[in-house]
């Protein structure tokens, strides 16, 4: 790695709680970029919460995020630990894009847009080993807890009490006249 000399790097065994706790106690924020988080993340998050350390990840595993929010949200607030999930591909263009658009719309029209649509026209790539492992872990979690499907099919499961805008009822391709393009909706986002 080409880190500046004043930035330390620690290698931690995610199965070794003592190693995790030692690392967490030496930092203000833990950034973890390798899942499956449902297999490796909870120990790190609970350690961060215990020490009031912030936590950021690339998680795209709604079942895991729901579990952590449900079980640890209040304790994290009390300890001053901020838990930030999903700082990866899905969030960067859309979450930050919507924020930027809404700020510009508000500045120009003195109100927010009632909805914002985002499209990815072309994308190259394939599933990483981590994504494939996360999918496999999610299938195993569904096998042991069939009720998890209710979290996975609800795009608002991570925002208790919030139902948001109406979602598409199906995942069939749709033609969008605004951009003259046929698209598929990502199942965990708005259309």
Where are these regions (language model features)?
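Rossmann-fold cofactor-recognition segment
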Residues: 3-14
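Conserved Rossmann-fold cofactor-binding substructure of NAD(P)-dependent oxidoreductases
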Residues: 14-26
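ADP-ribose/adenylate-binding Rossmann-like module
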Residues: 48-63
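Rossmann-like dinucleotide-binding core of oxidoreductases
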Residues: 77-181
């Amino acid at each position: 790695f080409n880190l500046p000399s004043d930035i330390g790097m620690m290698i931690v065994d995610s199965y070794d709680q003592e190693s995790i706790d030692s690392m967490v106690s030496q930092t203000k924020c833990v950034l973890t970029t390798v899942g499956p988080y449902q297999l490796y993340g909870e120990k790190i998050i609970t350690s961060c919460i215990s020490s009031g350390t912030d936590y950021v990840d690339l998680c795209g595993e709604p079942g895991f995020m729901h579990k952590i929010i449900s079980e640890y949200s209040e304790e994290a607030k009390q300890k001053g630990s901020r838990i930030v999930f999903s700082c990866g591909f899905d969030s960067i263009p859309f979450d930050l894009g919507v924020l930027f658009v809404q700020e510009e719309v508000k500045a120009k029209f003195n109100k927010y847009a009632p909805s914002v649509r985002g499209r990815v026209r072309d994308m190259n790539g394939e599933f990483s080993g981590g994504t494939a492992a996360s999918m496999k872990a999610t299938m195993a979690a569904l096998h042991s807890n069939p009720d998890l499907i209710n979290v996975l099919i609800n795009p608002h499961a991570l925002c208790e009490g919030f139902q948001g805008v109406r979602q598409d009822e199906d995942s069939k391709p749709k033609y969008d006249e605004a951009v003259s393009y046929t698209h598929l909706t990502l199942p965990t986002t708005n259309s």
